[in-house]
Amino acid sequence: MNIQALINDKVSQALEAAGAPAGSPAAVRQSAKPQFGDYQANGVMGVAKKLGTNPREFAQKVLDVLDLDGIASKTEIAGPGFINIFLSEEFLAKQAEAALADSRLGVAADEAQTIVADYSAPNVAKEMHVGHLRSTIIGDAVVRTLEFLGHKVIRANHIGDWGTQFGMLIANLERVQQESGEVSMELADLEGFYRESKKLYDEDEEFAVKARNYVVKLQSGDEFCAEMWKKLVDVTMIQNQRNYDRLNVSLSRDDVMGESMYNDMLPKIVADLKAQGLAVEDDGAQVVFLEEFKNKDGEAMGVIVQKRDGGFLYTTTDIACAKYRYEELGADRVLYFIDSRQHQHLMQAWTIVRKAGYVPESVSLEHHAFGMMLGKDGKPFKTRAGGTVRLADLLDEAEVRAAQLIESKNPELAEDEKKAIANTVAMAAVKYADLSKHRTTDYVFDWDNMLAFEGNTAPYMQYAYTRVASVFAKAGVSMDDLQGEIKITDEKEKALIAKLMQFEEAVQSVAREGQPHIMCSYLFELAGQFSSFYEACPILVAEDEAVKQSRLKLAALTAKTIKQGLSLLGIDTLERM
């Protein structure tokens, strides 16, 4: 149950009954401190100001008609007109019982929407590097959360699979095939192959002529060029899939929707923009001038949709892409997990999309931007030699470091178990270090911090789960075979349940805002609340069997909530570490 939403509705009804205009925001939030209750309604002051009345007097009017029977044990007016709400122990215990009995932990499904999520988007014939990490794992965490809430999510891996560079790549692939027979689908060093192709293009005129010819042929649908192009795409996506699988990312080959998919739409879109009077000729190119964006001289900015040589640009593809996602995929929301430097480009494309009537305002186009991954020096994360860090190399190093960590903690474990634990911890550490940061900020990549067993880290959260799970091993009972009712006998129990009941609020926030760090913060706070409860409230040596069973139920709900929360982030738990 979303208790925040429930109370928000109740306060909204009371506001209206007390004389507030319909639709006035109740602004119910989780309280910052226990002395202010579990929730606080902050909307009274704004409404009182509009009505020209005393906020505290108006707050009292609201309280007089606020019906929280069976939910709150106490309400009070605080400060200039806040309403503090204290949940009743009976209500909390009842909600905890219901959550424990529900495989969804009490999280209600949303009214299903069709949501397209554009994330990862590596380039063909290039290896994935650390710059692809944020889009890939942030997007995947949000996608998992949306699916958990019952939405139909269409993953769109908008790979860079088109452009003039394919002429030289096809020409080089043909050369390799002629020299060594059929090309292995490994093509182990894609970066090297790309560099070699570029070198040949720059230094060998005969090769360059052939490459330029292949660009034209590919764009004209030539069978040989199309076959070679597909081979390059296949080789790249096989390699990328290894990274996705290692990272426990839910993308597959079926989710690829590359730039090339929209090629046939581009001429029609430019023709339509011209027919609507949106695109005009300027210096031989087709340009849409947007009053919403100004250049440095304060003039309407021109966005080129077709070059003077007839070629199309990324903006044209992005216009086609948004149109396709609405018209063909039936999207209600489209989420783009693309770095913050692309914001203006996207806004311009979407402005054209709206003006042309391709996507109605009822469909939400959302740029979920993210910052950069930095080294300890505060500069973009690079190798010691100053090069781009391959994603596969980063994951390899994470596994080596995690293996050393597990060896130092548990040298007595069997080798295969140590390896399995190390791999799980390694991928979790890389992902959680990123996901736990607000996505719009840059963050510093630090091996020591991400593999620490203290603080808001993956190892800490995975250990928190194993610690709770170990209680049941010691008790000799299953989490799913507990008797009796949950009864609150201590403030620490109440605080733990109150935090457990905020799980749905965290899930909804991640889905709404595209911010996985909200879930990380919630789980970290939950682990802290469990530690306080565990220290203050003996479980295995509780004063009687009823209290023991009740506390075991709270431990079970905590374990299940941590496991489910980490699962939504694409992170696995371990039964022992």
From Swiss-Prot:
Question: Which GO molecular function annotations are given, in alphabetical order?
Answer: arginine-tRNA ligase activity; ATP binding
This one is known as: Arginine--tRNA ligase
Known SUPFAM superfamilies for this protein? Anticodon-binding domain of a subclass of class I aminoacyl-tRNA synthetases, Arginyl-tRNA synthetase (ArgRS), N-terminal 'additional' domain, Nucleotidylyl transferase
Give the reactions, separated by semicolons, that this protein catalyses: tRNA(Arg) + L-arginine + ATP = L-arginyl-tRNA(Arg) + AMP + diphosphate
Per UniProt, what is one Pfam family of this protein? Arg_tRNA_synt_N
Instruction: State the coiled-coil residue ranges.
Output: none
Q: Where in the cell is it found?
A: Cytoplasm
Q: Which NCBIfam families is this protein grouped with?
A: argS (TIGR00456)
Question: Its family?
Answer: Belongs to the class-I aminoacyl-tRNA synthetase family.
What residue ranges are annotated as transmembrane?
A: none
